[in-house]
């Protein structure tokens, strides 16, 4: 059975890294004896990407629809695939596909694998290999007589160590490295979150149960990365420190096994309780920590249902800064009734606490509190605006829009920041500064493209 997995063409502003999720599915398919192929079309135009997909016939084509700004292209693929190969099954999965399956099922997709997908994907392939029906499988959605059927959710994986060990042979890693200027990959070491932040969809995708790979397994993946002569690894978990003892055991094992790849991670402001954990981070090679403070206003923090305080973040930043670990604080502005003073509080707090910081404008992401009442559902033009500081929920939309761009101008024109992006000693640290310029450039480029699209649509409507 021939199976193609696709990372879709996407209007993204962010760096391009290999898809860990599709790598898992690719390796699962290989273990079952399927002829698996994987193609990354992230930076390829829709037309060129479709040409690659249609270059041969497959039994199953799986399109990852993880981000809302990738949905417009994902919504087109199945129709175009079936025009040439009507017998090919078109399936999808990922965050957006899980939370808004109607966007894909009503656009010619046969099945959606929703939520955590590895077990369901394996069961799906096994059924198809023996020409058995798949409609009763847990974890899938499909259309029946024009209505969406959503089967019972698949049980969560209890042991993440059972996931396939990373194998990068299907990726031309040198292309990723050349684009970023750094031999860098990201890893997933945990899933799930016990919290329920208002703007987040993590629990809708991965559940409330926090699960993690064992320290031994993560160190094994670090060793694989070290054999590839990588210069930096970033752990892409929502909060790598939710189980602090597991983090400590991992750091100690890195030290004991003499693994020397510089690395970074994302954590919550109150997750590390023991001060000695910070010392272990330094000794194990951690050079950067991303922290989601979200707002410098306690009122808004509570409305976001954040499980920590501004004081927790101050304490964390102080402990990291004292040990020379680079801090990357993240904030969100644009809450519905946020005042100018509150918006400025967040900006100036980030400037004060973090050498690197990033601000997002609050978006109505699928699965968040703000999605259900958002008027842009199903609108591909609105979807393309996600991730580019253009989808704004607040009453005073112009304020976060303008302030975002003013602060970005001063942030990126800072000569100290430019110097650090060019000459910081550590490659991982230098990359952390430089990638923000890459994202800013792409954001500006994508905004210009979207403005042109919007203007053309306006002219078409005006001229009838």
Regions found by a protein language model. Name each.
Residues 103-120, 280-288, 346-359:
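Structural recognition of alpha->loop->beta junctions
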Residues 8, 41, 93-95, 238, ...:
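Cofactor-binding loop segments of dinucleotide-utilizing enzymes, especially the Rossmann-like FAD-
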Residues 12-13, 101, 195, 245, ...:
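Flexible glycine/acidic-rich beta-alpha junction loops that bind and position SAM and/or redox cofactors
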Residues 161, 166-328, 348:
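Radical SAM [4Fe-4S] cluster-binding motif and immediate context
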Residues 2-8, 30-31, 35, 50-60, ...:
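Radical SAM enzyme core and accessory elements
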Residues 10-20, 66-71:
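A short, glycine/small-residue-rich beta-strand->loop->alpha-helix junction that serves as a flexible
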């Amino acid at each position: 059975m021939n199976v193609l997995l696709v990372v879709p063409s996407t209007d993204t502003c962010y760096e391009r890294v290999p898809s860990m999720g599709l790598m898992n599915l690719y390796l699962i398919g290989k273990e079952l004896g399927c002829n698996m192929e994987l193609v990354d079309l992230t930076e390829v135009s829709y037309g060129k990407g479709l040409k690659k997909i249609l270059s041969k016939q497959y039994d199953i084509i799986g399109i990852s629809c993880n981000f809302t700004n990738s949905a417009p292209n994902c919504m087109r693929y199945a129709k175009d695939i079936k025009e040439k190969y009507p017998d090919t099954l078109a399936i999808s999965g990922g965050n957006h596909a899980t939370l808004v399956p109607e966007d894909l099922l009503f656009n010619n997709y046969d099945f959606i694998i929703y939520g955590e997908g590895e077990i369901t994907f394996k069961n799906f392939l096994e059924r198809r290999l023996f020409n058995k029906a798949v409609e009763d499988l847990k974890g899938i959605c499909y259309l029946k007589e024009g209505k969406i059927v959503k089967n019972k959710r698949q049980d969560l994986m209890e042991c993440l160590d059972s996931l396939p060990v990373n194998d990068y042979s299907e990726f031309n890693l040198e292309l990723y490295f050349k684009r970023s200027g750094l031999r860098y990959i990201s890893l997933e070491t945990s899933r799930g979150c016990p919290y329920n932040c208002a703007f987040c969809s993590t629990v809708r995708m991965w559940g409330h149960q926090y699960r993690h790979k064992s320290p031994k397994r993560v160190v094994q993946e670090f060793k694989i990365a070290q054999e590839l002569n990588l210069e930096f690894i970033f752990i892409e978990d929502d909060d790598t420190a939710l189980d602090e003892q597991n983090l400590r055991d991992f750091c100690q094992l890195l030290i004991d096994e003499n693994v020397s790849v510089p690395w970074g991670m994302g954590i919550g402001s109150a997750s590390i309780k023991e001060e000695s954990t910070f010392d272990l981070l330094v000794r194990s090679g951690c050079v950067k920590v991303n922290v989601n403070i979200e707002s410098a206003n306690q009122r808004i923090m509570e409305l976001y249902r954040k499980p920590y305080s501004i004081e927790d973040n101050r304490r964390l930043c102080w402990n990291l800064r004292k040990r020379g670990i680079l801090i990357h604080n993240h904030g969100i502005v644009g809450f519905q009734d946020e005042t100018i003073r509150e918006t400025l509080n967040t900006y100036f707090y980030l400037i004060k606490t973090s050498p690197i910081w990033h601000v997002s404008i609050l978006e109505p992401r699928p699965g968040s509190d703000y999605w259900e009442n958002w008027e842009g559902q199903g609108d591909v033009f609105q979807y393309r605006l996600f991730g580019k500081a253009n989808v704004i929920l607040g009453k005073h939309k112009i304020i976060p829009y303008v302030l975002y761009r003013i602060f970005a101008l001063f942030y990126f024109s800072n000569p100290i920041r430019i110097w650090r992006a060019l000459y910081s000693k550590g490659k991982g640290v230098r990359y952390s500064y430089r990638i923000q310029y890459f994202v800013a450039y792409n954001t500006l480029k994508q905004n210009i493209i979207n403005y042109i699209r919007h203007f053309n649509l306006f002219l078409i409507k005006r001229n009838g």
